[in-house]
Design a protein with these regions (language model features):
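Short loop/turn segments that flank or connect secondary-structure elements
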Residues: 1-223
Length: 223
């Protein structure tokens, strides 16, 4: 079973100076996270209901840390055309207008599409955050029920317990690596944080200086 967080992550983050070095360390960590999940699925013969083209989970609130948001921001700036980037920024503005007036609880009881969802697919799949990579289902019908009844927060999750537990521990371990090195450990909502990252270059400098990265984004209280 591969180690997670990868043994190199603390050193990668500690020695990073440029955005590219920070993002490189996180990319390697995300690859290790995927390897960990795939190994568990293979070893335990977990039968996932997830399939290409299904986007029911892309209407859920997505919690992220600032380092994940900055990787996504770098990715869209580098990979999207000017037209695609402008369209994304417009969708992020609409998304923020919907989400910012809501409490996190109000948000999770509504279906609000991720602004990064395009034609039923994730437009930043290669750099999607840990919480999206952790999410999985054993039962499509359970996902459909959650989508159809967003206010029913008592419906049992259709996760594989061992897989979800292990990936949650790994996700928290990665976040703790950044926190121990003095970086912002606030839990943000993805769309509102990405909107600010793209709109406000100083957010990167604040984060790099150990301050709170995003001042307007929706925040999820720590458990």
């Amino acid at each position: 079973m591969p180690d997670f967080p990868p043994n190199s992550l603390p050193a990668d983050v500690a020695r990073a100076k440029s955005p590219e070095e920070f993002h490189g360390g996180l990319r390697r960590a995300l690859a290790g996270f995927d390897e960990l999940g795939a190994r568990i699925v293979a070893d335990a013969a977990v039968k996932l209901a997830c399939c290409e083209g299904c986007s029911l989970c892309c209407w859920l609130r997505v919690d992220v840390h600032a380092h994940e948001v900055f990787l996504i921001a770098q990715h869209v700036r580098a990979r999207f055309t000017e037209t695609e980037l402008a369209a994304l920024i417009a969708r992020l503005a609409v998304h923020s207008a919907k989400v910012l007036p809501l409490t996190p609880y109000e948000h999770v009881t509504q279906n609000i599409a991720c602004p990064l969802l395009q034609d039923g697919r994730c437009s930043i799949y290669a750099v999607r955050p840990h919480s999206c990579r952790r999410h999985h289902s054993l039962d499509f019908a359970a996902c459909q029920f959650t989508y159809d009844h967003p206010t029913d927060l008592e419906a049992p999750a259709a996760h594989d317990r061992d897989l979800f537990k292990t990936l949650t521990e790994a996700m928290l371990g990665a976040a703790e690596t950044y926190a121990r090195l003095g970086y912002d450990d606030t839990i943000y909502e993805l769309g509102t944080a990405l909107a600010e990252a793209l709109d406000t270059p100083s957010s990167w400098r604040r984060w790099r200086d150990g301050k709170r990265a995003f001042l307007r984004a929706s925040v999820t209280p720590a458990a």
